[in-house]
């Protein structure tokens, strides 16, 4: 059933000025939670994100016998024996793609029958390529629909060997195999195929986290890695702020000619979405073509910003956005066209945004269907900073990765109506 709650962001009359601390990185937090759960001993994760996605990951670990304590709102203390027990119930992971993909592979290293499941949205998101790769490694795993639920019969460890997976597919599949590989029965080589490597920066995040937890990974050229069966060591690990969350604040600053201090320089991030900061800094002269393949979670932000640019912007390399929390290409196109007919058009898997700076200061009657996708809600709030009458459906879906988003905007002087 379509959620009925709506939120309207009231246009601002002055530049947004202030300091906002973005939450911890979702991508890094869920990697760190998984690795801490696989390690023997106690790990302290600081700067962590507390949100729907990290909650379902931590709850899944608890169900399997891992102790996860939360002494404050940005810390997890994870104590594990390094051995997980199969729970009596399915592991419910909501719509968390990272948790679902990462756990599916990791569970092959333990004894017992496991089921990984999610909500109605997760049950439409593909996991078949990861299941196929695990089957080729000898894992007894199935997902009849090609999407969750996934049934895994663990036999105590991945077999040593080489596994190939298409690099054009989700980087989460690659990361899942790499992280699981360190707990196998012998060395595992993960090799990418395909003409392009999608979202390579997220693979680099995975490798850095693995090495921080004691894994030994050897690069074999640019597209393959050999993971030794060392397991993981408990450690203290600090998580940087979320670059995807930062993009909304960078864009809000650009749109209002403001000055928002995030407490961290844009070039200090290791996450690939931080690349968007350079494009946002070029506003209102964003480039005519933007390749989103290496910063996919930043594309919703950039697409809404492009509506106010001085020239049209074509987004390419974004096909994977169709299988995120929703079909984000379609959601962006429909949302922009709700603001102004013809403002955006889908051309294959490209998104063309017809810039119209004159939209600023106008009033429209636009209901934005977020499809309960946090990034659609957050990016269209940016349009509301300049255009009156934009109503956002299901605004609380931002809790997936940025529960404090509306409060952050309010701290800068943005007013909203519910």
Swiss-Prot record:
Keyword Cell cycle belongs to the record: no
Catalytic reaction equation(s): 3-phosphoshikimate + phosphoenolpyruvate = 5-O-(1-carboxyvinyl)-3-phosphoshikimate + phosphate
Pathway: Metabolic intermediate biosynthesis; chorismate biosynthesis; chorismate from D-erythrose 4-phosphate and phosphoenolpyruvate: step 6/7
Binding residues annotated for 3-phosphoshikimate, in chain numbering: 26-27, 31, 170-172, 297, 320, 324
InterPro entries in alphabetical order: Enolpyruvate_Tfrase_dom, Enolpyruvate_Tfrase_sf, EPSP_synthase, EPSP_synthase_CS, RNA3'P_cycl/enolpyr_Trfase_a/b
Subcellular location(s) per record: Cytoplasm
MF annotations from Gene Ontology: 3-phosphoshikimate 1-carboxyvinyltransferase activity
Enzyme Commission number, as recorded: 2.5.1.19
GO CC terms: cytoplasm
Stored SUPFAM superfamilies: EPT/RTPC-like
Alphabetized UniProt keyword annotations: Amino-acid biosynthesis, Aromatic amino acid biosynthesis, Cytoplasm, Transferase
UniProt-listed CDD domains: EPSP_synthase
Annotated residues for binding of phosphoenolpyruvate: 26, 97, 125, 172, 328, 375, 400
Gene3D superfamilies cross-referenced by the UniProt entry: Enolpyruvate transferase domain (3.65.10.10)
PROSITE patterns the UniProt entry points to: EPSP_SYNTHASE_1 (PS00104)
GO terms classed as biological process: amino acid biosynthetic process; aromatic amino acid family biosynthetic process; chorismate biosynthetic process
Domain of life: Bacteria
Active-site residue list: 297 (proton acceptor)
Quaternary assembly: Monomer.
Protein family membership: Belongs to the EPSP synthase family.
Function: Catalyzes the transfer of the enolpyruvyl moiety of phosphoenolpyruvate (PEP) to the 5-hydroxyl of shikimate-3-phosphate (S3P) to produce enolpyruvyl shikimate-3-phosphate and inorganic phosphate.
Annotated protein name in UniProt: 3-phosphoshikimate 1-carboxyvinyltransferase
Underlying gene: aroA
